[in-house]
From Swiss-Prot:
Tagged with keyword Isomerase: yes
Disulfide bonds: none
Compartment(s): Cytoplasm
Species for this entry: Francisella tularensis subsp. tularensis (strain WY96-3418)
Domain of life where this protein originates: Bacteria
Function according to Swiss-Prot or TrEMBL: Catalyzes the reversible isomerization of glucose-6-phosphate to fructose-6-phosphate.
Family that this chain belongs to: Belongs to the GPI family.
Protein name: Glucose-6-phosphate isomerase
Lineage: Bacteria, Pseudomonadati, Pseudomonadota, Gammaproteobacteria, Thiotrichales
Gene field: pgi
Amino acid sequence: MLFCDDSKKYLKEQNINLKNEFDKDDKRVEKFSLKHQNIYFDYSKNLINDYILKSLLESAEKSSLKDKIKQMFNGAKINSTEHRAVLHTALRDLSSTPLIVDGQDIRQEVTKEKQRVKELVEKVVSGRWRGFSGKKITDIVNIGIGGSDLGPKMVVRALQPYHCTDLKVHFVSNVDADSLLQALHVVDPETTLFIIASKSFSTEETLLNSISAREWLLDHYEDEKAVANHFVAISSKLDKVKEFGIDLEHCYKMWDWVGGRYSLWSSIGMSIAFAIGYDNFEKLLAGAYSVDKHFKETEFSKNIPVIMALLASYYSCTYNSQSQALLPYDERLCYFVDYLQQADMESNGKSVNIAGETVNYQTGVVLWGGVGTNGQHAFHQLLHQGNIFIPVDFIAIATSHHNYDNHQQALLANCFAQSQALMFGQSYDMVYNELLKSGLNETQAKELAAHKVIPGNRPSTTILLDELSPYSLGVLIALYEHKIFVQGVLWDINSYDQWGVELGKKLGKNILKAMNDDSSDEYQNLDDSTRQLIAKVKNK
């Protein structure tokens, strides 16, 4: 059964008024909220009632979702266009049951690789790993892009209060040299260890940054042997790693069944472990594993990722929602939106179904947002008074790591107030009467009132964590990962390929050749606009 069929459009005719729904049902919050571990999921401020939720759940039951969940966890090749399993969940699976992929028990492989990463982290932290000159390592520079950067960077920042190793961790991703130079300006070549995170060891941005970092190191040492003491790699291309000068003993595995945007649980998370210690890294994995079990074993009506996906898909199909705002009310989650943008938009930004047929319904949305309370002084105006339908996810942390309780209370009060304002708004009469009470005369009040009306009845979900710990962050990330998967199933698309990014890469290589040789075929085949842009650059 296709989720985005015409029947969903009739649900909109329920004409949900959130204020009325709360007034007439004192059990609404109890009915439309869930709890998992230390996370409370309140979806009571969404445009649903019992009938709508029942209809959405029935659609999920009639879909292939149950089978797809089993297939994913059992190692079926649900990434159909690349003929790959999707098993980032295996990286955090604490069970010992064999899991066979292409004739091999990957559980044993994962356990072995985790141990290798743990040993490296402990070796560097303890000082047993030394730089070429014999000095202890003080700085880690992770060179990667996309999933090899966004996930680890987000986690390292989010868990800053858990940093316990005295190692400073830096991230370099953009091909713009400024990204690399920001790191190189603050590190010492004699005490820096670089991580090259690239499955193919040929990603343009990562390779160029790595080559420049290598040159920077050798400018100091003037000895090729120094590379082995200052570089490790995470890649599946051993020949290229060896050619770079990295000891293969210090090359860590990337498997085809782990997509880049779901790779922070793998050796790609090495930079996380360098910051928070391997024990805390394991707690991050354990939190995600608890959600995997919840997702696999919980009926849909109480399954948080399923409810998240049903709501988002419902708004997309029925309200033509093209946008989703994500508002974490915690500065430590300042990179969380960037991370989820890739996870969500690269996964579900598709226009053909699994069979390769063009779909006639909307799939992925633009995910955007920023930390509170900053957003209140920037883009919240659009959320409250704009005429675009934008569902909102609020993320809040009940207790903080610091002792500034007045700050934390103000932060939470603002978060809850924003969700309440989106729900209730304020009518013309309310505004008009308030303006009269403030001292304006009737004419002045009438002139201003229309500009201060806030429609309200705008949907939001609030996710409240007891604390932001390695375990709870693992829970939060995994909830969104599985939400993305469920949406892909409901829309009948492949959430685990990303062919849309390939054309730009290919054209970029052609244009680079054209910029260096205007007699080349690549230059001759350019459009006039691109030729002019190249000419403008060359004339500067």
